[in-house]
Amino acid sequence: MKLNRSNFSEFKKYPEKILQFGEGNFLRAFVDWQVDRMNKAADFNAGVVIVQPLEQGLVDMLNEQDGLYTLYLQGLKEGKAVKEHSVIDCVTRGLNPYTQYEEYLKLAENPEMEIVISNTTEAGIAFDENDKLGRTCQNSYPGKLTAFLYRRFKTFNGDKSKGMLIIPCELIDRNGEKLKATILKFAELWNLEKEFADWIEEANTFCCTLVDRIVPGYPRDTIEEVHAELGYEDSLVDVGEQFHLWVIEGPEWIKDILPFEKAGVNIQVVKDVTPYRTRKVRILNGAHTALVPVAYLYGLDTVGHSVEDKVIGKYLTELVYDEIIPTLDLPEEELKYFAGAVLERFLNPFVNHYLMSIALNSMPKFETRDLPSLLEYKKRKGQLPKKLVFSLAALIEFYKGKRGDEDIKLADGEDILELYKDLWSKFDGTDACYRNIVETVLGYEKNWKMNLNELEGLTDAVTENLIKIDKLGMKEAVKSVM
């Protein structure tokens, strides 16, 4: 039996209020799940029309199931491993604007439409000068949205109360601002009246956002077991972790439109998304990158096993709480709560997150994710953070390319791999040689955007740690910073 509204008549059809660009796993497991929760727990009463941003997509499959699909959420919830599933029923239909262009534009004539959501990948918010305003669909997402907004502007004669709340989820910095700027470029390219540009500025609200949920997506390897468990066929099963966070930079009145507090979903409306983005990069991504060389050389292979390990788990926890959190400008309790949630996510028993999959481009990752914490810690405390410095030394050892007798498959820029190959191939075991390796790596300004040898005490500390790691092995060396 197939999942659709004929076979399952208990599902409600909601009035269409949300236009969503993107039908992929992430939006369905993140935004649509939250809309579903708000519908069921807070009487949001909002239906989502999904527009596929590319010619090839899933809307035909979505329409075959009348917008219904099953979402599994699996991971740790308040310390317990939880796997739960539900049918999401907020999607009313899907449209392919390449074959249904006029039907797509007609959505703009619906006075109840009030929100635009999108996730068209990092490359999606782009200006395409070949896009035209005519009878055929534009290629770019901002081009399509400009055409939609222009139809709305014309239909309602520039009524300022008919503007949209526009919330892009693309993983680029200042995504709302970039989308708005691109739309205004199209207004100029198409020679649209100045009143339209004014209406875009004054009647519409573009929000910058940060989204956070790991979504493995369609469970290809276990789909037969999933269908057997469900008792029906679903071609759009989706899988996400329990944790979710949606930070929206925008006005307070968004809380009146999205009843997230009543529904118990983790949406935060803030004045500035920047510290939240910094928090995620420094704590979540920074913890990953600082962990990899230490845990891998210790003999561990996954993030979960690393956090479970008595020594490495303690090392990582202390690194996050004692060395990263003190460098961030958000309320301490909020940072500690976020860090606790991150470490819990790392323990997700349903996901095998391999250290080597995170190890890709570790040098530039350390520069963007961990170096800012190291520098800020030194600035605020007047001393170096022991564990971040140790992780940096472990990174240099990692790029030796050996774990015991096995080779490490290093993956980084050609220049970085050459640098390390040259340094370690000339290694003669003397303390002077260790120091030369450290000085050369820390002085590689192309990666660090500065000469790290100029940071007081860093060259000595990294050299001392590198000697311990290389001579004693990671299991012994890590004890010195605990």
Curated annotation (Swiss-Prot):
Alphabetically, the GO molecular function entries are:
mannitol-1-phosphate 5-dehydrogenase activity; tagaturonate reductase activity
Catalytic reactions on record: D-altronate + NAD(+) = keto-D-tagaturonate + NADH + H(+)
Q: Does the keyword NAD apply?
A: yes
Q: Which residues bind NAD(+)?
A: 18-29
| EC number from the UniProt entry | 1.1.1.58
Tell me which UniProt keywords the record has, alphabetically. NAD, Oxidoreductase
- What is the disulfide pattern of this chain? none
In what pathway does it function?
Answer: Carbohydrate metabolism; pentose and glucuronate interconversion
List the Pfam families: Mannitol_dh (PF01232), Mannitol_dh_C (PF08125)
Q: Which GO terms describe its cellular component?
A: cytosol
Q: A GO term (biological process) for this protein?
A: D-galacturonate catabolic process
Broad class of enzyme this protein falls into: oxidoreductase
Taxonomically, the superkingdom here is: Bacteria
Instruction: Family membership, please give it.
Output: Belongs to the mannitol dehydrogenase family. UxaB subfamily.
Q: What is the protein name for this chain?
A: Altronate oxidoreductase
Q: Which organism is it from?
A: Clostridium acetobutylicum (strain ATCC 824 / DSM 792 / JCM 1419 / IAM 19013 / LMG 5710 / NBRC 13948 / NRRL B-527 / VKM B-1787 / 2291 / W)
Q: Name the lineage.
A: Bacteria, Bacillati, Bacillota, Clostridia, Eubacteriales
